[in-house]
Amino acid sequence: MNCCAHVLNTVLRNAFDDRYLAQELPDLLEQLQKVKAVVTFLKQSGLTSQLPHGVCQEICTRWNSKLAMIKSVLSQYDAIENLLDSRGNLLLEDVNKTLLTEVAEFLEPFKEASEKLEQDKVVTLPLVLMYYTKLKKHLTADSTDSPEVCQLKSRTLEFLQIKLPIEELHKVATFLWPPFRHLRVLDEQERKGVHDRVRELLIDVHLRLPQGETSTDHPDYEPPAKRTSLDEFKEWRDAAETQPADSELDRYLRDSDSCEDIEKLLELWEAHRRKYRGLSFLAKKVLCIPSTSASSERNFSAAGYVLQDRRTCLKPESLDNLLFLHKNM
């Protein structure tokens, strides 16, 4: 699976490609360039010290820096305008504040999705399908949107559907999050496909697991059954076919147990390891898969800070210990 954070970055980089904006949305490109020029002037002139807060400059390799730049200007727009007017500077004169606000609102859900998917101490794979659906809904043009934002949404939606295909594993992971077990985010055919796939996986899991009681729903003691007239013919009686995969899946679908906090999802499945023996095993196997590689990249960055040109004599175990402390303290 692709890193979802990288995919979102690629989607937005293509959506805000300068060549595309210059041809199709020149007014939007002009507004973004004006904001960038304002931030550059404030930083180079040292005037940021006279503002309530600092301003952020856009970095071409990070789409979220575009949002940070716009918000840093809009949040103190009046203060910046007064400061520039006092110096006879007209950089803000033709800035379309309404359009910039729309662009910020357009980018905000992507920021939320990226931050949630890049968490490294929380299960994130079930969130991929949910945020994908939420972003698709967000990218549906609204009657209140400006023509520029409508076109931007259309282009971004096109790239999102191409670059971020929802895989079977994403759907299974969402199914294993109890509040969304019925997969109402999918249509009926897709739901059936996920259920069929989970049944297949459970059959394989039950073959691998040692035989034994699979549920604590049954009491430890049951009174002996009364003898019936059929007992004398029991050797010829039809055997009831047991299908642990089906019964376990059906019980899970009927269950009312929930887990609103995704941070406790693995704890829930650990607590249900006897009630749902196969599903618990499957959940631990699937939910441990991260949706992004952000955590690994943060560790690589930390390693670069720890192991420097003047600090190359560290033993491998010392480097590992320092990285462990950096990660967990």
Predicted regions and their residues:
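Surface-exposed, charged/polar loop-rich segments
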Residues: 1-82, 89, 152
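Mobile genetic element proteins and their domesticated derivatives, centered on retroelements
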Residues: 6, 38, 65, 70, ...
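Short coil/turn segments at secondary-structure boundaries
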Residues: 14-17, 74-75, 84-86, 185-188, ...
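Short, hydrophobic/aliphatic alpha-helical segments
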Residues: 47-53, 274-289
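Conserved, non-catalytic sequence blocks in retroelement Pol enzymes and Pol-derived host proteins
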Residues: 58-60, 94-103, 116-126, 161-165, ...
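Short, conserved catalytic/metal-binding micro-motifs enriched in Asp/Glu and His
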Residues: 65, 114, 173, 177-178, ...
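Extended, C-terminal/distal alpha-helical "rod" segments
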Residues: 80-248
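Polyampholytic, low-complexity intrinsically disordered segments
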Residues: 207-209, 259-260, 307-329
